[in-house]
């Protein structure tokens, strides 16, 4: 068996039995969690496919290791390799200190146009949680990754650039509500129809493919009408135009209320649910953040913009055990490019101590296996994590919050996971 590249066709990914997958080991605790994660992935693939499939890992450089070896934080060769091989796994990366140097994570997303930040959030039995019913949390967040206020179009207070922007807004556009123009920094919030449509399309298709019940469009369109309000409307339009008979939208519901009354609308939605149609609804962001605490079971797949998605993903992660067990992926569903990554930082004070929880990196690799269509291997890892946590053999972050837990190192936790792969 010889290793081959994953390729993309109009029908999706073409995954050989021995794909070559680049990995970025990461900074700080990156080496510790990668050693653990890669062993668990390899063991699950071996167990699931009896040696008929395996991954050939190919290291590429980014972050501190790249800078030390090449003088560049994100070498062009790394970008070209990921572009060529489509799929990659990465650990946490240090953001270089110094003006004008952007986050390496953001740079990777923008260079590869990874427009979806995918963040599934669910609870594993036994994981300590601050909420009463963490088992009600089972959501998949589709966060737009390339636009919004995170696009990085900012002008610092006091510069000639910001003065030009403010002068233009006031004198050319008639903006009179910049409260303190002499001392303001300015940020630009682009939200496009195309960017919205490709995100919402991916979210609805995911819901259909994975037997989910609804997609919630989360926005602050009541205040930001031409950006977040447009996101909501474009999302509804896309659902109606491209998924017609597979979805039932709240806008359809409102139309039926107007024409036939609320009872008829409730009946139509109930019928749609019985037929397995995806319910497309929306929620204002601040109300949504309350609902994920008070009644999280009402939401399933969530599609939202960049800033909202950042808040929502980490708020939900806190309800199920924190970002130490929160997986993430950055995906372009059109080109096939995807990077699967731990969602936490580099935690430099724990670097090399063999102490931290590798679950975020491992579960991100589960997302990768699912993305490749290797569901059997993915399920084996998920089942093993459930069994291991239920047996209270955990790393320090959980052990300190669980009665009767046995605290183990990063590598010992990986050993336990491998032992529990059935």
Swiss-Prot record:
NADP(+) binds at residues 94, 344-350, 357, 396, 400. One of its GO terms (molecular function) is NAD binding. The record marks 150, 220 as: Critical for catalysis. Binds 1 Mg(2+) or Mn(2+) ion per subunit. Its cofactor is Mg(2+); Mn(2+). It is an enzyme of class 1 (oxidoreductase). One of its GO terms (biological process) is glyoxylate cycle. SMART domains: Iso_dh. Catalyzes the oxidative decarboxylation of isocitrate to 2-oxoglutarate and carbon dioxide with the concomitant reduction of NADP(+). Homodimer. Belongs to the isocitrate and isopropylmalate dehydrogenases family. This is Isocitrate dehydrogenase [NADP]. It comes from Staphylococcus epidermidis (strain ATCC 35984 / DSM 28319 / BCRC 17069 / CCUG 31568 / BM 3577 / RP62A).
């Amino acid at each position: 068996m010889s290793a081959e590249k994953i390729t993309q066709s109009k029908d999706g990914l073409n995954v050989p039995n021995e794909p070559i997958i680049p990995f970025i080991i990461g900074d700080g605790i990156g080496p510790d969690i990668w050693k653990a994660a890669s062993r668990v992935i390899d063991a699950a693939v071996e167990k699931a496919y009896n040696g008929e499939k395996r991954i050939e890992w190919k290291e590429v450089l980014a972050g501190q290791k790249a800078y030390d070896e090449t003088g560049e934080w994100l070498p062009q060769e790394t970008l070209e390799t990921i572009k060529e091989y489509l799929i990659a796994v990465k650990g946490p990366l240090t953001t270089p200190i110094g003006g004008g140097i952007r986050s390496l994570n953001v740079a990777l997303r923008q260079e590869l146009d990874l427009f979806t930040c995918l963040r599934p959030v669910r609870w594993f039995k036994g994981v300590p949680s601050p909420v009463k019913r963490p088992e009600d949390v089972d959501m998949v967040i589709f966060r737009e990754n390339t636009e919004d206020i995170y696009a990085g179009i900012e002008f610092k207070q006091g510069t000639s650039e910001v003065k030009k922007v403010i002068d233009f807004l006031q004198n050319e556009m008639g903006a009179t509500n910049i409260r303190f123009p002499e001392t303001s920094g300015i940020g630009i919030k682009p939200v496009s129809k195309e960017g919205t449509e490709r995100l919402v399309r991916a979210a609805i298709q995911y819901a259909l493919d994975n037997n989910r019940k609804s997609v919630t469009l989360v926005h602050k369109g009541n205040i930001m009408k031409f950006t977040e309000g447009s996101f909501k409307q474009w999302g509804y339009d896309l659902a109606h135009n491209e998924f017609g008979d597979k979805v039932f939208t709240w806008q359809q519901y409102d139309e039926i209320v107007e024409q036939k009354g609320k009872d008829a609308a409730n009946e139509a939605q109930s019928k749609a649910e019985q037929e397995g149609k995806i319910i497309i609804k929306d929620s204002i962001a601040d109300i949504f953040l309350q609902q994920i605490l008070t009644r999280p079971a009402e939401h399933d797949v969530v599609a939202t913009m960049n800033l909202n998605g950042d808040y929502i993903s980490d708020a939900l992660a806190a309800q199920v055990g924190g970002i130490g067990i929160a997986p993430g992926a950055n995906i372009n569903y059109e080109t096939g490019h995807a990077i699967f990554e731990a969602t936490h930082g580099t935690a430099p004070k724990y670097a090399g101590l063999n102490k931290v929880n590798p679950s975020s990196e491992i579960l991100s690799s589960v997302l990768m296996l699912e993305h490749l269509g290797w569901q059997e291997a993915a399920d084996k890892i998920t089942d093993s994590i459930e069994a291991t946590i239920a047996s209270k053999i955990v790393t320090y972050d959980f052990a300190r919050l669980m009665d009767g837990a046995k605290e183990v190192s990063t590598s010992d936790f990986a050993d336990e996971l491998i032992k529990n792969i059935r």
